[in-house]
Amino acid sequence: MANTPQAKKRIRRNQARAVVNKNRVSRIRTLVKKVEAAVAAGDKDAAATALKAAQPEMARGVAKGVLHKNTVARKYSRLTKSVNAIA
């Protein structure tokens, strides 16, 4: 248990940041699922639009330290590849 006032404050701050980070990751996951759903449906326009919406959010996740840059690079590469594969 935290004894100093600063340690107690850090616990409060960490809990608040955890909520923000969880929301950010959830938003990214939702956007990725939209791309995957559009690809599964074979809708190239919707998939491309969803990918354009997901990419900056994923980059923001890296900038904020929520996701690792290699993870985002891999996900973005795979999504782009799947969107481009639609006939």
UniProtKB/Swiss-Prot annotation:
This is Small ribosomal subunit protein bS20. GO terms for biological process: translation. Keywords: Ribonucleoprotein, Ribosomal protein, RNA-binding, rRNA-binding. Transmembrane segments: none annotated. Binds directly to 16S ribosomal RNA. GO terms for cellular component: small ribosomal subunit. Belongs to the bacterial ribosomal protein bS20 family. Pfam families: Ribosomal_S20p. It comes from the Bacteria. The gene is rpsT. GO terms for molecular function: small ribosomal subunit rRNA binding; structural constituent of ribosome.
